[in-house]
Amino acid sequence: ARQRYGSAPKPVVKALEVLSSSIYNPVRSQEGCTESIICARPSWNVRKASTWSSGERYYHLGDIVKAARGYLKAANDQPNLVKKETFRYDLVDVVRQALADAAFYQLQQVRSAFDSGDLAVYRKQVKRFLSLISDMDALLATDSQFLLGTWQKRALDWGDSRQEKALMDKSAKMLITTWIDQVPRSLNDYSNRQWAGL
């Protein structure tokens, strides 16, 4: 923590210990990372966003929630930490992961409510699920590195003419969504991102 943030607040040290023994330390090899269902095409049984990822969750949601709480406590206790780009990035990224994992489990609650036929419970569960997505978008908007607009601007800067800029914009959007614009799309969402505005 000290090397990355210039200080080592206890809540962050504890958060990093939890992450080091959990999400940062998979018990077996897997191809790709565990992906957020928020980035996936809508489905009742979604477990991953891309066509090639395993979609396996090898860590407990409670671990990432503990780590997120540690980062949030440190940010609350020492507001100057949030001014450090490295801390802010990690804070947003860890809380984002906690929200993404919560959404995975919340979708199961939505499905269960749908299957039960109880419309009131279903609406309540859907509202919670959509709230997680809104909360994530608001969180991601707090750091420019998690903004779709930042990605788009960088891509547009590579083009000189209007046509080049249009091509760069299209290519940049394809890279983080469909990957290719042909059928079959065996690499759909290969490089999916959780960014505000996407």
Where are these regions (language model features)?
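Substrate-binding groove of N-acetylhexosamine-processing glycoside hydrolases
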Residues: 1-198
